[in-house]
C-alpha cells in the first residue's frame, strides 16, 4: 500500500513543481518589468549591469529556496504518515527540477513483470517475451503437423465426397445414376450362369409331389450342387 501512496505523493509533488515553475515565471517577469522601469529612469541609467543581474539571480534563488521549503515540508509529512523515507524522491534542484520522474522510471523498470516458461531448466526469471515463445511451443506440441498423404490416398480422399453428394432429393447421385443406366434389368442377372458352359439344370417340379410337399431327401437332391456345375431352379 505504501508503494501506491508513494505514487500519489509523487503526483502531488509534480503538481507542486508545476506551481513552483509557474510562480517562478511570474516572479521572473515581475523582476524583468522592474528592471525595465529601473533602466528607463534617466537618473538611474548609470547603475552597473552586474548589479541588476545579481538582483535577478537573488530573486530566482529566493523563489527556489521557498519552493524547496514547501517540498521538504511535504516530504516530512509523508515520512510521518507512512514511515517511509522519501528523501531520494523529493530532490529539488535550483527550484525547477524534481528527480522523482527519474527515480520513478527506474523503479518501474525494476518492477517489470517476469515469468518463467514451463519446462525451463533454471528457475531464473525470464522476460515476458519468453512466455510467448513458450506458448507457441506448447501450441505446436498440442497440434502437431499432419504428414502429407500419398497421391493414391489423396485421389481416393478427393473422390469420397462424390459418393455422398445428394441430388437435392436426399438420394445418392452416383447410386441414382447407376440405377438409371441399369434400367429394369435385374442385378442378379449378371450373376446368372453362362449357357455356353456345361451346366446342369435340376427342375424342381420333377421332385415336388402332387400335393406340393417335398421330402427331406428331395430337398437335399435339389439343393446339392456338383463342383463345376451350376444349378438353376425353376419355379413351379
UniProtKB/Swiss-Prot annotation:
Residues 102-135, 165-209 are annotated as: Disordered. It is found in: Mitochondrion. Residues 105-126, 192-202 have a biased composition (Polar residues). Keywords: Mitochondrion, Stress response, Transit peptide. Its main location: mitochondrion. It comes from the Eukaryota. GO terms for cellular component: mitochondrion. Residues 1-73 form a transit peptide. Transmembrane segments: none annotated. A motif (MAHS motif) lies at residues 126-143. Mitochondrial heat soluble protein acting as a molecular shield in water-deficient condition. Improves osmotic tolerance of human cells. The MAHS motif is conserved in tardigrade MAHS proteins and forms a predicted amphipathic helix. This is Mitochondrial-abundant heat soluble protein. It comes from Ramazzottius varieornatus (Water bear).
